Amino acid sequence: MTLKDKISPEEVAARRRRIKTLRLFIQILILLIINAQIFGAADTGFPAPVLYPAGAPYTVMVGAYYAFEKTMTSGALPFLALGVIFLITVVSGRAFCGWACPFGLAQDVVGYAPTKKKRPDRIINKDLQFFAQLFLFISIIIGLYVGWKTYKGTDADVREGLGVFSDAPFAVYSPAATLFATIPYMIGWYPDYDDPIAFTDFGILFWLRLLFLIAILYTVAYVPRAFCRWFCPLGLIMGECGKYSLIGLSRNPARCDKCGDCEKVCPMGVRILDYPHERISDPYCILCMDCVAACPKDALEITFNIPKKSSEKK
């Protein structure tokens, strides 16, 4: 393909539809696998590298971040949860965010709303990621403190003081937990379930959780994947590790004319053209393939390599 050769707009649109359809199919399939108790499967309790609550009806897995918190507050080291997160991320970066996470699916569905989408710049993305950093910090501090008290057998007073925050702090206000566990519990999908974060009455904490969920989904209608960008502590961990993943994105400089179509369709606001062509090592990249499908010059591709070091922006 020469610099003058371009794929027609019709073919680009068709490729984007195919990628979106494939991704939606895989997201729904994985959601069904995670909730395989519907089909009679047993609960495994295995941590999956997605944001999903342990208390969701029919789930056979738990979200790795929930397992990370729960293990710490139980007085143990979260080797399994962290191992799953790091292993998956070192291989595929944040691809699970783009192709497997149930709350990512929820955001993608909301993103179809006919609203004028906004493209926050890199500075805003970096500044607002403070919330994800704060959530991670709270999880670690509470997890280590409660875990240490539990290990020594002196955790009763601490747990009484922290209440529902003493087991898995982020799960208490996680919009994924509200959407997939609390709301189904409230509408009676599984009346025998008993968990303190399910909130069996419509108290103030329930309404605060619901308000946070609504605020997140409203924001997502205008800023695609806003929760993944700014609020998800699991995404924060995976993004930093993903800069060194074996599977990544590269750009062919001989084909690329820097038209910017790739950046316009990126749901995470990655500034692809700011990176060296050998590897786009952005912590926000979820390998959704939207940019690959949108490029009229076929200049972008998924590559498999061992990065020598994290690519620095120009």
For each predicted feature, which ranges?
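Short linker/helix segments within small regulatory modules
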Residues: 275-288
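Walker A/P-loop NTP-binding motif of AAA+ ATPase domains
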Residues: 266
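Aromatic-flanked redox-active Cys/Sec active sites in thiol-based oxidoreductases
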Residues: 253, 297
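Membrane-embedded alpha-helical bundles of multi-pass integral membrane proteins
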Residues: 2-231, 236-247, 270, 292, ...
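Cysteine-cluster motifs in flexible loop/terminal segments that predominantly coordinate metals
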Residues: 228, 259-262, 285-291
